[in-house]
Amino acid sequence: MVRRTKADAEATRHSLLDAAERLFQERGVSRTSLNDIAVAAGTTRGAIYWHFRDKADLFNAMMERVVLPLEETLNGTGKNPSDLEDPLQALRDAIAHALHKTATDERTRRVFEIATLQVEYHDEMHAVRARHLQGRNDCMQQTAKVLQSAANQQGLTLAIPVQSAALGLHVMIDGLIQNWLLDPKAFDLRRCGRQVVNTYLAGLGFPPVALPRPRTRRMRQPLKLEEA
C-alpha cells in the first residue's frame, strides 16, 4: 500500500509539471496561476502545495527535468578542459549536441522556450532569475576555460580577451536558439549553428574548419550521334 501511495504521489507531481509546461508555453508564466495548473492536471490546489512551496519552486522543478542547451555545453566539456585531448573539438561537439537536442527533443525545446520567452522575473520569480544567471555564469566560465586551453594547446593568442570570447559565443548560441524558436522553419538550427560557430572560432584565431561544399547537379553531356 505504501509503495502505491508513493507511486501515486510521484505520478501527481509529474502530472502537475506536465500541466505547468503546457500552460506556461501557451499563456506565459505570469498569466498562469497555480489553480490553473491544478485544474489542468485534474487535481486540487492543495496537491500543488503538497509538492511545491510556490510557483518558483514548481518552475525550478520543471526546469530540472531537462538539461538545457547551456548545461549540455557545460557537461560536454568536462570539469578540467586542460585534460582534454582536443578542447576545441570537445566544445564544438558539445554545442552541436546541444543544438541537436534542442531541435529534436520536444520537452527540451518547450522548456527552453518558456525559460527565455515566456517568463517575467518579478515577485516570487526572483529565485528563478538567480538560477538562470548562475547557469549562464557557470557556462561562460567553463567556455572561457575551454577556449584558453585550446589556445594554449595550439600556441595561439586569441583576438580578444578570453572572457569576451566566451561571452560572445554564449550570446551567439543563445540568440540563435531563441530566433529559431520564434520560427523553426526559418532555418536549419543544427546546420546554421555549426556554420556560425566555426566562423566565430576562426575569427578568434583558431584554424578554420573546412565546410562541405553544397552539392551541385552535374550536367549530362549530350549524346553524340555516330557518323554514318
Question: Predicted regions: what is each one?
Answer:
Residues 61, 75-110, 162-169, 215-221:
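Hydrophobic alpha-helical connector segments
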Residues 207-228:
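C-terminal effector-binding regulatory domain of bacterial HTH transcription factors
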